[in-house]
């Protein structure tokens, strides 16, 4: 095989290795992450379900404190079984009555308060769902950024591979290199194409995951994520912020309030209900009768009905309080984890930007120069080239990791929005 043929074959390999990778991405920019978040918050079916549950809970506040419907009754009061005595016997009458069951004072207010507390739990769950969805979009966006930066590095590696191919061809043409170097250069081009193929497949999976959050077709394309927005971390203790602003803590705190209201309702259920009624009695030719009724419920089965319900409500309140303490502990632990990950990300970013990335570039240049001068081995060139690729891909991943930490922290410690209807 001639030297010219080897050089030509190597050039063709370098030029076509990446061209056979499927799923090439159009040169379009992806929407900003905030645009995608707005789209997700507007379209998400899971969020819509939580919103519907909150609306349903709010609709139940007014009915919770409503009185029972009144009862209309018609009564025939006849003396004797043989004759119709209405109009002829004083105590005989045909009456129409309206009776209204009345709740013990405080029961209606307690029931409304409990329903309001249940709605507040659902409102806190809605805020949790919104924050979770927002964090998911941001984290996925950050991973896509890392994938797109790595893709750019792999595509740019084609130019470096061309340069290495020229170096190998020059040495081989001069009889200063073995065919092994030519094959290794070709192999490296194929391996870069393999990495790019895997990367694009992984990117497609991430885009499909993002499309699910946006409630759009899984195969809907997404342009290149060219950059991440700045991540501004809050000042002060993240653990304190997580304890006061954490959405899971808010849900647990609202659950404690709801459990306390439920206990109050259970205790009031031990009080007797009342009833009142009024009616008129028709007595034929005799004067009509005025009927007034007032009744008091006798809580005869209190030991078997109301008191067990009170004890159960007390246990449920204790459970809710324990779950609140656990939610606070989880929030503090999550904040501590994010502190450690943020510090790690900052250190590693500094290390990659100021040391590893420039060092790998210098190593590739030095290895190529040594090989061209006949002082080095081509395996060293390939090894340094792979380090160069990995360093740039890892730098993008470290940037992605730092942004993901910020996204999770925002979901954990961002101030809760003002309640609906509050005016500044």
Predicted regions, residues:
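Periplasmic alpha-helical coiled-coil/stalk elements that build and connect Gram-negative outer-membrane
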Residues: 2, 31, 129-244, 338-341, ...
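Transmembrane beta-barrel strands of outer-membrane/channel proteins
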Residues: 72-78, 276-282
């Amino acid at each position: 095989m001639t030297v010219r043929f080897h050089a030509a074959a190597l050039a063709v390999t370098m030029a076509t290795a990446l061209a056979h990778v499927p799923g090439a991405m159009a040169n379009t920019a992806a929407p900003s992450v905030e645009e995608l978040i707005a789209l997700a918050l507007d379209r998400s079916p899971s969020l819509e379900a939580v919103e519907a549950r909150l609306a349903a809970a709010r609709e139940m506040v007014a009915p919770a404190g409503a009185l029972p419907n009144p009862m209309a009754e018609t009564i025939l009061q006849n003396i004797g079984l043989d004759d119709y005595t209405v109009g002829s016997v004083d105590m005989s009458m045909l009456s129409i009555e309206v009776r209204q069951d009345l709740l013990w004072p405080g029961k209606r207010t307690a029931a409304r308060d409990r329903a309001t507390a249940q709605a507040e739990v659902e409102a806190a769950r809605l805020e949790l769902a919104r924050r979770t969805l927002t964090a998911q979009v941001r984290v996925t966006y950050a991973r896509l950024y890392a994938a797109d930066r790595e893709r750019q590095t792999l595509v740019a590696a084609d130019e470096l591979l061309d340069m290495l191919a020229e170096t190998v061809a020059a040495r081989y043409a001069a009889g200063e290199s073995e065919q092994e170097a030519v094959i290794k250069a070709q192999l490296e081009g194929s391996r870069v194409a393999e990495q790019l193929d895997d990367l694009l497949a992984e990117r497609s999976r991430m885009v499909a995951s993002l499309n699910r959050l946006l409630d759009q077709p899984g195969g809907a394309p997404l342009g290149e994520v060219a950059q991440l927005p700045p991540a501004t971390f809050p000042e002060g203790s993240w653990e304190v912020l997580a304890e006061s602003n954490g959405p899971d803590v808010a849900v647990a705190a609202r659950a404690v309030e709801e459990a306390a209201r439920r206990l109050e309702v259970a205790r009031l259920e031990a009080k007797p209900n009342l009833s009142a009624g009024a009616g008129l009695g028709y007595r034929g030719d005799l004067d009509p009768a005025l009927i007034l009724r007032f009744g008091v419920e006798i809580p005869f089965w209190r030991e078997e009905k109301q008191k067990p319900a009170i004890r159960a409500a007390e246990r449920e309140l204790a459970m809710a309080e324990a779950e609140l303490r656990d939610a606070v502990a989880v929030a503090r632990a999550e904040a501590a984890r994010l502190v450690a990950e943020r510090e790690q990300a900052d250190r590693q970013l500094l290390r990659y930007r100021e040391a590893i990335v420039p060092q790998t570039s210098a190593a590739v240049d030095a290895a190529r120069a040594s090989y061209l001068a006949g002082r080095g081995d081509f395996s060293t060139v390939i090894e340094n080239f792979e380090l160069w690729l990995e360093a740039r891909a890892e730098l993008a991943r470290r940037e992605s990791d730092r942004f993901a930490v910020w996204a999770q922290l925002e979901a954990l410690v961002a101030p809760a929005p003002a309640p609906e209807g509050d005016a500044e």
